[in-house]
Amino acid sequence: MKKTIIKTVIITLVSIIIAASLAVGITLAVSPKTIGKVFTKCGNYDTAAKLYESQYKKTESVSDLIELVSMSIAADNDEMIAKYGDKLTVNYKGNMILMTSDEEQFDNYSKATVVAYYKLGKKEDCVRVAFLSSGAYTEGNSLYYLFRLCDNKEDKDLAEEIYKYDKKNSNAIVEGKSEMQKKVKAYKEKYGF
């Protein structure tokens, strides 16, 4: 009698473990972001970001890309912020603004991408994203932030990248362009390039 009860309990526990493992496995295969939400609530942002990355690779939808960039920022994963923030802010700019109807949020993603590239030492990409994701040199956007970053760090290399990008590309900056040009000229005079 005891052996039958113990055997039944063991079979039941093994069955529950197998069923739970199958449920998690199927959910991971079908919708990684569902499991990512669990890791987010637990505070494990790195794992959640990787799961959101899997979700984005499956769907390539802008909404999944937004969630991936947000989670990468929460995880402070500069490589993922740079890679996917670039896609979001440069390639999907119109879609992003339309989807969120919040240009300030878009600017936050752009600034995070600029900072990530800067931390990774990819200053040319840092400058490119700032220029391409901004239509103006106005306080609060990534282009303005780039110049502030350059000033605060007194980064000659970054200033030179800004100068080269501005001279090489006929950018679409209209609003605040004269103020921006003064800053570029000041960098040229200060650092002598």
Regions found by a protein language model. Give the residues of each.
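Structural motif corresponding to the intra-repeat A-B loop/turn of tetratricopeptide repeats
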Residues: 42, 75, 120, 152-153
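Structural register within alpha-helical repeat arrays
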Residues: 35, 48, 68, 113, ...
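Terminal, low-structured helical/coil segments at or just beyond the last alpha-helical repeat
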Residues: 157-193
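Hydrophobic membrane-insertion alpha-helices, especially the h-region
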Residues: 10-26
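Alpha-helical repeat scaffolds
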Residues: 49-53, 78-95, 122-134, 155-170
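Alpha-helical segment of the N-proximal tetratricopeptide repeat
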Residues: 30-58, 67
